[in-house]
């Protein structure tokens, strides 16, 4: 597992090593588009998973764009989460049909290290491919946040990546 320079900020890494590590992480993440499906009643789980990566991406000189459906990000929450307040940009009350198009345009520009958008429906293969291509062009990361109700998850089985931890073995 890669440990970021941010996590080791108290260490005495030379600046060039630190910058090389950040560049390696940026290049490895280029073109990454991931969907985060979470329970509506447990949004903290998604935050716990994403915050370390968002903090690391916040070290870049580029913006972080949040395309939120209705809620406005709290200034206090952004600061307490360790995200760079001066690099977080938000567009709220965006209609779901415009979120995908906005994400593609934002990812493609290269102005954002990460673009986070909320979707209510699953993406088609074509939509996902468009996001991945835009993220590669802009050397950016995209996160699709998709809240689901607890009873909706129990009705069907999802295939996906299982992350094993030696904490439980």
UniProtKB/Swiss-Prot annotation:
GO BP term, example: division septum assembly
Cell cycle recorded as keyword: yes
Lineage, highest ranks first: Bacteria, Pseudomonadati, Pseudomonadota, Gammaproteobacteria, Enterobacterales
Induction: By DNA damage, as part of the SOS response.
Entry protein name: Cell division inhibitor SulA
SUPFAM superfamilies referenced in this protein's UniProt entry, alphabetically: P-loop containing nucleoside triphosphate hydrolases
Cited Gene3D superfamilies: P-loop containing nucleotide triphosphate hydrolases
Gene that this polypeptide is encoded by: sulA
Assembly and interaction partners: Interacts with FtsZ.
PANTHER family assigned: BLR3025 PROTEIN-RELATED (PTHR35369), CELL DIVISION INHIBITOR SULA (PTHR35369:SF4)
Lon protease binding, as annotated region: 162-169
